[in-house]
Curated annotation (Swiss-Prot):
PANTHER family: GLUTAMYL-TRNA(GLN) AMIDOTRANSFERASE SUBUNIT A (PTHR11895:SF151), TRANSAMIDASE (PTHR11895). One of its GO terms (cellular component) is glutamyl-tRNA(Gln) amidotransferase complex. The active site is at K85, S160, S184. Its EC number is 6.3.5.7. One of its GO terms (molecular function) is glutaminyl-tRNA synthase (glutamine-hydrolyzing) activity. Pfam families: Amidase. Heterotrimer of A, B and C subunits. The keyword rRNA processing does not apply. The keyword Nucleotide-binding applies. InterPro entries: Amidase, Amidase_CS, Amidase_dom, AS_sf, GatA. Keywords: ATP-binding, Ligase, Nucleotide-binding, Protein biosynthesis. This is Glutamyl-tRNA(Gln) amidotransferase subunit A.
Length: 513
């Protein structure tokens, strides 16, 4: 492998899988190459909370031995290593949700998606950093470390899943899993130049995903190409009887749609431009790249029309009532008695269970988690439930109906993913409302339960990535994969290669020499 490490890790996940099938490379060699990059990059990127190198090598060796005789029959992405957001439980590998309250917890079981990855022969490189309990938009709220954006290590990678996005962008992993509650896959995707997908709610099992807001959470792929995301989503998707919100049907034909889209023929497709998402609050560079991408869709034959989603302006307010309310309920289980952190009062003897719970939660939760628990508890309290939580759910229903009406007019909706490019560390930490505004364009899809995807749209005037978002009808995830793959191909053609050709990667220099 020697000095080929940098070349190998820059291959897409699909290309790495093809090399495994041909016998050009083994799964062990892929894992070793990425572990080298992780060792070199982590001092400056800090994407991983836990690197499970020994586990990944053991899984790779088992795969190589099993697949030695019949490589042609291998499933898609077989042998390709993957990184996992530390919000998804992994048997035998510490899982913390980036919180002190779960420090040292090693789950006795795997999430459904992890079982599927293992069945597909994908070794697990490690667990990636996030905002504590996936609550944040910058990955600055992790209890352990701050992840840096590979495009500018003085800037945030987005959140909550900045670890997975940065790991993929920095070539520490070819592909990763994240969770998306209000944009936690897509917004980091926009800020790091990666592809981030939130599947239809219920399209991927949530069994084994640590609950933040159960009616909004969704596991999805993080990758460098649209095809890689399609391949991964088909692997992890499908019905799971252990998840009561799981959709009964199997995965949609997303891989076929992505491959069809790469032909760059969008004749007959009607694309809706969400008129409420743009203008004030969106950086000029973001809007410029977005408009250029829309022009590319038109050049490929798509009909682009302006569409109104009338109640989308209320999304942020409704979300920040519904989500904290569910957080308040879900995080009540961390009480210091069943598992995780336990903190005693100074006397060493708690007067009551509530007394011990108070000390544990005070020490174990960070400021942003406490803020959301307080907000949610207030919204659910007697006398305020109908005025706050009940009203927010009514707004959510209106937004769901808005999307249904919009999709009667068009096949797919488009909007910028994030109103800005990556901001500097600390810039918004003291202003929660400014931080929350980062998700203004991603939250609506979570409230409506519809699938959405962010792909790179180029670099803004500040040299930082901009994201372009596709939103498709519920349970029609494949509809967004075709135009996304087409736009990806058209843009890369105009850039003379993928966006990461412009990324400076000093951690790759000299690898293997």
């Amino acid at each position: 492998m020697s000095n080929e490490t940098a070349t190998l890790v820059k291959l897409s996940a699909a290309e790495q899988a093809a090399a495994v099938k041909k016998g050009d490379v083994t799964s062990r060699e892929l894992v070793e190459a990425h572990l080298k990059v992780i060792e070199a990059a982590e001092p400056s990127i800090k994407a991983f909370l836990k690197v499970s190198g020994d586990v990944a090598l053991e899984q790779a060796d088992a795969f190589d031995a099993k697949s030695a005789e019949d490589k042609a029959a291998l499933p898609e992405l077989a042998g390709v290593p993957i990184a996992i957001k530390d919000m998804i439980v992994t048997k035998g590998i510490e899982t913390t949700a980036a919180s002190k309250i779960l420090e040292g917890w090693v789950p006795p079981y795997d999430a459904t998606v992890i079982e599927k990855l293992k069945a597909a022969g994908m070794p697990i490189l490690g667990k990636t950093n996030l905002d504590e309990f996936a609550q944040g938009s910058s990955t600055e709220h992790s209890a352990y470390q701050t992840t840096h954006n590979p495009w500018d290590t003085e800037r945030v990678p987005g959140g909550s899943g900045g670890g997975s996005a940065s790991a993929v962008a920095a070539f520490e992993a070819p592909i990763a899993l994240g969770t998306d509650t209000g944009g936690s896959i897509r917004q980091p995707g926009a800020l790091t130049g990666t592809v981030g997908v939130k599947p239809t709610y219920g399209g991927v099992s949530r069994f084994g995903a640590i609950a933040m807001a159960s009616s909004l959470d969704q596991i999805g792929p993080v990758s460098r190409t649209v095809l890689d995301s399609a391949l991964l989503q088909e692997i992890i998707g499908g019905h799971d009887k252990r998840d009561s919100t799981s959709i009964p049907e199997g995965p949609r034909p997303m891989v076929a749609a992505a491959r069809e889209g790469a032909k760059r023929d969008l004749k007959g497709m009607k694309v809706g431009l969400i008129k409420e998402l743009g203008g004030d609050g969106f950086q000029p560079g973001v809007e410029a790249r977005f408009n250029e991408a829309v022009d590319k869709l038109k050049e490929m034959g798509a009909e682009v029309v302006e569409v109104s989603v009338p109640h989308i302006g209320y999304s942020l307010g409704a979300y920040y009532i519904i989500m904290p309310s569910e957080v308040s309920s879900n995080l009540a289980r961390y009480d210091g008695m069943r598992y995780g952190l336990r903190v005693m009062p100074p006397t060493g003897v708690p007067q009551t269970a509530a007394n011990m719970m108070a000390y544990t939660r005070e020490a174990g939760f960070g400021d942003e988690v406490k803020r959301r628990i307080i907000l949610g508890t207030y919204a659910l309290s007697a006398g305020y439930y109908d005025a706050w939580y009940g009203s927010a759910q009514k707004v959510r229903t209106l937004i769901i109906e808005d999307f249904k009406k919009a999709f009667e007019q068009v096949d797919v909706l488009v909007a910028p993913t994030s109103p800005s490019t990556a901001f500097k560390f600390g810039e918004k930490m003291d202003d929660p409302l400014a931080m929350y505004m980062n998700d203004i364009a991603t939250i609506p899809a979570n409230l409506a339960g519809v699938p959405a995807m962010s792909i790179p749209a180029g670099l803004s005037d500040d040299g930082l990535p901009v994201g372009f978002q596709f939103i498709a009808p519920q349970q029609r995830d494949e509809v967004m994969y075709k135009p996304a793959a087409a736009l990806e191909a058209a843009l890369e053609d105009s850039w003379n290669g993928p966006i990461w050709n412009d990324l400076k990667t000093p951690w790759l220099d000299g690898l293997g020499k």
